[in-house]
Structures are given as structure tokens and as C-alpha cells.
């Protein structure tokens, strides 16, 4: 039949299949920023296209060409990619300047800060449900400094649906 789709029975897919979650991690990214001192309270940052040397622009959907000052709360409300990227840049020990190059000096520390915070919410670790074939997600050991930026808005590591459900239930 035209337009028909084949479906596969996958009763355990919520614990075995992983995907890159995207914006859902932004609450945990804010937590990592607060705990590390990279940001404080409802700090205002400028949501603007992020221009890193020799890289494509990173934008937020609502300000893909312009800029706008937003608080941490608004960054969640508007799902700001660039607010999260600025947190990652601060975790790298740098301040955002258009056209900047990223230093790799604090790359491991920054990624560890993000991943450890995410793990506290259940992402990238076993849920303890004791079900067969549970995946802990896909957490690459090798990464570069650009991956730290994309990790901050959920476009690098991959998690299971049950991990994300646990995360959402904990917040």
C-alpha cells in the first residue's frame, strides 16, 4: 500500500535504543553552569548568532539573525541554543567574542562538568531498572572542543527514552 510503513516490534526500545535528544538537556546545562560558577541566578546573556572561527554559525531559532538579551529562565522558555553555548564557552574558561578561536586547555574539564551533571539526572548512566539489554547511552570517549559546545544544547551524546524520562521526572 502506498505510504504504508513497516513497523518493528521493539518492546524494549525505550531502554535499548539511543538518540541525540536535543533541547531537553538545556535544564541540566543550566544546572552545570550554576554549580560551576559559569553563570549565576537568572543571569542575562545575549542570545546572538555564535561565530567561532572556521565554524558554521550556531543560532537559536528565534534570533537566527539578530540578538536579544535574555535571562536563564527565558533561555529555557525560548530554547536558546546560544545561551547554552555561551555556558559551554565559560566552562572552557573563555568569554565569547565573535570570530574567536576556542582553546582546548579546559576541554576535558568542561565536557566532564556537563556529563557529570547530566549523569546526576540519569542521562548516560544505567537507570538501575534491571532490564535486559539496557543501554547507558552513547557517550563518545573521543571528542573535540566543538563537541563541548554542541553537547550543551543536546546535539552530541545520545540517551535512551527511559533515561530522559528519569531526567524529566527528577526535575
Language model features: what each stretch is:
Residues 1-22, 28-171:
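Beta-lactam-recognizing serine transpeptidase/beta-lactamase-like catalytic domain environment
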